[in-house]
């Protein structure tokens, strides 16, 4: 309980991400880099707190719910918790479903408020989270999550289509703003693109 899904027979997960699913490997790397078993305990306790504070609709908080939910979901996925995990599976699936519903409702756009010029942050972080969920849950452990593939495809494609002509991304997804983009926005979008690539989806 609280140890995440595990197993060595998970070739669907890129090798860069696979080690998170081995408790022994995770603990070994933790100890070798100055951590302790208490660090792992603290992480599990934090995940339990997140589970306890999750909203009934699968989101977290009452502000910027899409972004906050995506960040919370990424913490579970980072511990190799999937929709099928014994202790946290319900929380993971509920969060994924919440984000899928947002994507489906908005034609791939992932944001709490599409009128807010800063919604590009939420879209990138949420796309990252959904892609990570697809790779871990579907490719890695063969879990069936309705419409997850469609959400990843549509949200990822929107991200690609909305790139600034200068190569970056900018507020409100302006494609021709004078400044050409924002470094922090670009960073999240590159992370989302990397996660989308790992899904293996075309």
Predicted regions located by residue number:
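Preference for long, amphipathic alpha-helical scaffolds in soluble/luminal domains
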Residues: 1-202
């Amino acid at each position: 309980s609280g140890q995440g899904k595990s197993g060595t027979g998970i070739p669907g997960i890129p090798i860069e991400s696979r080690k998170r699913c081995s408790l022994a490997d995770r603990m070994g790397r933790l100890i070798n880099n100055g951590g302790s078993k208490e660090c792992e305990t603290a992480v599990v306790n934090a995940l339990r707190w997140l589970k306890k504070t999750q909203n009934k609709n699968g989101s977290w908080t009452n502000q910027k719910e899409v972004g906050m939910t995506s960040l919370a979901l990424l913490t579970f996925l980072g511990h190799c918790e999937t929709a099928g995990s014994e202790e946290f599976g319900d929380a993971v699936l509920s969060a994924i479903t919440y984000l899928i519903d947002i994507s489906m409702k908005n034609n791939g756009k992932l944001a709490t408020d599409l009128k807010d010029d800063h919604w590009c942050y939420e879209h990138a972080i949420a796309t990252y989270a959904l892609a990570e969920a697809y790779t871990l849950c579907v490719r890695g452990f063969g879990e069936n999550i309705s419409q997850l593939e469609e959400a990843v495809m549509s949200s990822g494609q929107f991200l690609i289509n909305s790139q600034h002509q200068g190569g970056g991304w900018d507020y409100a997804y302006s494609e021709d703003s004078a400044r050409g983009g924002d470094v922090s926005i670009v960073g999240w979008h590159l992370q989302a693109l990397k996660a989308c690539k790992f899904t293996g989806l075309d």
